[in-house]
Amino acid sequence: MCTVVDPRIVRRYLLRRQLGQGAYGIVWKAVDRRTGEVVAIKKIFDAFRDKTDAQRTFREITLLQEFGDHPNIISLLDVIRAENDRDIYLVFEFMDTDLNAVIRKGGLLQDVHVRSIFYQLLRATRFLHSGHVVHRDQKPSNVLLDANCTVKLCDFGLARSLGDLPEGPEDQAVTEYVATRWYRAPEVLLSSHRYTLGVDMWSLGCILGEMLRGRPLFPGTSTLHQLELILETIPPPSEEDLLALGSGCRASVLHQLGSRPRQTLDALLPPDTSPEALDLLRRLLVFAPDKRLSATQALQHPYVQRFHCPSDEWAREADVRPRAHEGVQLSVPEYRSRVYQMILECGGSSGTSREKGPEGVSPSQAHLHKPRADPQLPSRTPVQGPRPRPQSSPGHDPAEHESPRAAKNVPRQNSAPLLQTALLGNGERPPGAKEAPPLTLSLVKPSGRGAAPSLTSQAAAQVANQALIRGDWNRGGGVRVASVQQVPPRLPPEARPGRRMFSTSALQGAQGGARALLGGYSQAYGTVCHSALGHLPLLEGHHV
């Protein structure tokens, strides 16, 4: 019953396929019937179930309205109220895959990919931190990617603003939250009485290490085991570092240190890891939060120097002030009414995603320090839009290929060119250097060295690619509120797939690549017909 889609959603969007489902929601790939834009629709089940869920829904919507204009942060295009007054629909720009799927696939990320992905993550994190907002849940599955290696940070349900907290560190209490254990900072694991922006920098270090290693750096099976893996790898904390955490945490850390055997970070990484990557990792994975590199400092590190361009690294000049004080938890009806009020305000401003200030300037832009409207390379670098999807690709849909809105939202198509050339630290190309080809991320694992791939391996790669790539996408901008009154013209009915067309990727390992591609063998598969026998060469003395 939870998966029933409201009629207003069906009238506005053509649902293509389900991308994922969990205990709290479901995500579909869909096409806007009016514009042809490919989007991702997230339905949050019972979004206002209790105070915690209501607060998380409220935070995600408000913070995405504040930061969604950044080229490396996912854009919230629409917020739609469900008819049952419990669920809520969030419409996002569509991305092909996520970093977790790419890492699990193995062999797809080259050194230049790792550097560019991490640079874009640092750009997004710097923008958040400049508004004094901490994400608190940065992990590979929350880093979305496309084939142009463009990064979009998503899932702001656990993010919070530190601007409304008292200035005294003793008053910045840590609220309990459920984040993925493998990327939690030591102070979070130790239930320290305060936290800082350094929580995100630790998570970024874990993400970088996982991209370099191909698997998680600290895959703890419990909070205690997680802490043990960390403390036996990073340099031991000083007495001053332990005192800063509080007396309750100090005894726990000292007990865990003990006489356990130690290892170094370089022992966990491949032998060909660059010295710059190892140095950056060591500066991020530091026990004391105030001794870790900040996002601004990390952007100046030699590891990402080729992409570093200060004019393209946005920062806010003022803290983000949430619509509800972080230290005060509202009631469920109050959170619900505030979210619905935001939807009404968006609908009254011709589809814009932000409230307008006294001079028509949105709050997210009122204190934004960015030299240009859209971050891009110097004018000598050609700007290229998203690559067109081949007509022969599996699952190609003409409705997804062209987007009337795409031509109107040029500033949203600006992050891919950041990766199309090697730059000096000042954002200029080295003297005499030629323009580098566009950086793309092949989402299919390459086959053996120099050997021509067999038909079976080609089929297996194609099916695996279907499971990894979500499809083409077009960028958009601004939150819109769907109108229930307008009924768009009907599209021609889709061909209904047969039962054999489902779950081919999941059964590929058991049935083979060729069968997975065909969706199952027919009775004629693997047999030789009479006409084929007639063309076989006959040996001498055996003519009929």
UniProtKB/Swiss-Prot annotation:
The modification Phosphothreonine is found at T175. The keyword Cell division does not apply. It catalyses: L-seryl-[protein] + ATP = O-phospho-L-seryl-[protein] + ADP + H(+); L-threonyl-[protein] + ATP = O-phospho-L-threonyl-[protein] + ADP + H(+). The active site is at D137. Changing D155A: Unable to induce the formation of autophagosomal structures. Is able to bind to MAP1LC3B and to colocalize with this protein to autophagosomal structures. Does not induce phosphorylation by methyl methanesulfonate. Loas of phosphorylation. It is an enzyme of class 2 (transferase). InterPro entries: Kinase-like_dom_sf (IPR011009), MAP_kinase (IPR050117), MAP_kinase_CS (IPR003527), Prot_kinase_dom (IPR000719), Protein_kinase_ATP_BS (IPR017441). The modification Omega-N-methylarginine is found at R449. Residues 265-285 are annotated as: Necessary to interact with ESRRA, to regulate its subcellular localization and to inhibit its transcriptional activity. A motif (TXY) lies at residues 175-177. It is found in: Cytoplasm, Cytoskeleton, Cilium basal body; Cell junction, Tight junction; Cytoplasm, Cytoskeleton, Microtubule organizing center, Centrosome, Centriole; Cytoplasmic vesicle, Autophagosome. Residues 300-373 are annotated as: Requires for interaction with GABARAP, MAP1LC3B AND GABARAPL1. Residues 13-304 form the Protein kinase domain. Residues 347-413 are annotated as: Disordered. Activated by threonine and tyrosine phosphorylation. Inhibited by dual specificity phosphatases, such as DUSP1. Phosphorylation and activation in response to DNA damaging agents, serum stimulation. Constitutively activated when phosphorylated on Tyr-177. Activity depends on the relative rates of MAPK15 autophosphorylation and dephosphorylation by PTPN1. Atypical MAPK protein that regulates several process such as autophagy, ciliogenesis, protein trafficking/secretion and genome integrity, in a kinase activity-dependent manner. Controls both, basal and starvation-induced autophagy throught its interaction with GABARAP, MAP1LC3B and GABARAPL1 leading to autophagosome formation, SQSTM1 degradation and reduced MAP1LC3B inhibitory phosphorylation. Regulates primary cilium formation and the localization of ciliary proteins involved in cilium structure, transport, and signaling. The N-terminal region (1-20) is the minimal region necessary for ubiquitination and further proteasomal degradation. The TXY motif contains the threonine and tyrosine residues whose phosphorylation activates the MAP kinases. Interacts with CSK/c-Src, ABL1, RET and TGFB1I1. Interacts with GABARAP, MAP1LC3B and GABARAPL1; controls, in a kinase-dependent fashion, both basal and starvation-induced autophagy. Interacts with ESRRA; promotes re-localization of ESRRA to the cytoplasm through a XPO1-dependent mechanism then inhibits ESRRA transcriptional activity. Interacts with PCNA; the interaction is chromatin binding- and kinase activity-dependent and prevents MDM2-mediated PCNA destruction by inhibiting the association of PCNA with MDM2. Interacts with DVL2. Interacts with CLIC3; MAPK15 does not phosphorylate CLIC3. This is Mitogen-activated protein kinase 15. The lineage of its organism: Eukaryota, Metazoa, Chordata, Craniata, Vertebrata.
